[in-house]
Each structure stands twice: as C-alpha cells, then as structure tokens.
Amino acid sequence: MARKAYSEEDRVQVRNALMTTMIQCIADRGLIHSSIDVLCRKVGISKTFFYSFFSSKEELVLYALRYQQPKLLDYARSLMEDPGLSWRAGVETFLKNCCYGAKSGVAVLSIEEEQQVRHCLSEENFQAFRRDQIIFYGKLLSIFS
C-alpha cells in the first residue's frame, strides 16, 4: 500500500483533528476509554502517522487541553458579558458546563486520569503544562473578577 503524501496544510488539519477528537473522546468516555486506535480510526490515519505528531496519548492530551483553552476563555467572557446573567449565575453556569460533568464537549480529567497523564510525562513537559495552566487560570480569574 502506497503512503499518502501530506502537505503542511494537511498535517495542520490532521493535528487539529487529533486534538478535537481527543477532547470529544475525553468528554464522552473519559481518558481511559480513549485509545490511540480509536483516535486514529476516527481521524482516518495510521498509528505510525499519529506518532509523527505526538510521542504518546498523554502528550496529545496535554496539547488537546491547551487547544481548548481559548474556547473556554471565550465562553467565560460571553457569560460575564451576558446582561441577563448575574455574576454568580455566569460563574455557576461556567462551572456546571465545563467542570461538573455537563455534556458540553469540554475535556475534564478525573484525578485518576490526571495522575495517569502525569506519570507518563517527562518532567520538562509536565512543568511546561503546569506553567500554561497557571496562565490559563489567571486569565480565567481575570475574566471572573
């Protein structure tokens, strides 16, 4: 079987598809039930091609969580700017839809899943992710203030 040649634009689309598919899989089934095989099948690529983007499922999870951050910040902003919602109602809506299990397409890891991801990461990747999370939560708090 001949290999497909991917342009740089194709690679960007595949990478984005992997991240959005991972987010959806985590939101729908949780990380444990989100295998590389399932992701590759949904995106339409081989496992070999997957590994040209990410070294592991856990590395993809980090990138996917970063990838959804702008969407979450925009959502928080829209709630705070909604004249029909009080500050409290806006924050409660955000937490309900994004953190407490509402089926809103947002990837949220359980404590066990976070520990699994942490265990598989290099110290460098973990520290970089931790810095990104601190920045993200700072922006979120700024929106809610």
Language model segments and positions:
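Hydrophobic alpha-helical connector segments
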Residues: 63, 77-104
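Amphipathic alpha-helical segments used for helix-helix packing
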Residues: 89, 101-127
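Amphipathic alpha-helical packing segments from all-alpha helical-bundle domains
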Residues: 70-73, 77, 120-145
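Basic, helix-initiating cap at the start of DNA-binding domains
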Residues: 1-29, 37-38
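Helix-turn-helix
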Residues: 25-59, 63
